[in-house]
Amino acid sequence: MCGIVGALAFKGSSFTVTEPYITGMRDTMAHRGPDGAGTWISEDGRVGLGHRRLSIIDLSDAAAQPMSNEDGSLWISFNGEIYNHAEIRAELEQIGGHRWKTDHSDTEVILHSFEQWGIECLEKFRGMFAIALWDAKVRELWLIRDRIGIKPLYYSVHDARIT
């Protein structure tokens, strides 16, 4: 099971999200993902995501996380599995307008689904998942878990930030 972490400094906060801050949280979960680790910090230091990888669906480096869409406006750290990702990808390919980095990553399907349908994309997903998704266009952090909580998602609000 992968591990995801992140932080968001609230507007007006003096706190800055740094790579050591995210990496420190991420590396406490090294046992959750022996296949790799990644970190992303926004340019303004307001938000950061981290990921410990346990490769299941797409073993390629192109599927490493945190992952962004093609223009860098969406960033995701994801744990779980979208069982129907191939069907959703086929639908997105038929619609067109998306550039794919991977052959079959369910993480990338989530990103392009969010681009296409917004938060309503969740209605299409069948699976178990915990997701942290940063939408830079509207400056919103979405924390999402599957409907019955198979993949837990814990967060804390303190000191003008959420972690």
Regions picked out by a protein language model, each given a short descriptive name:
Residues 1-163:
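Cysteine-centered catalytic environments shared across enzyme families
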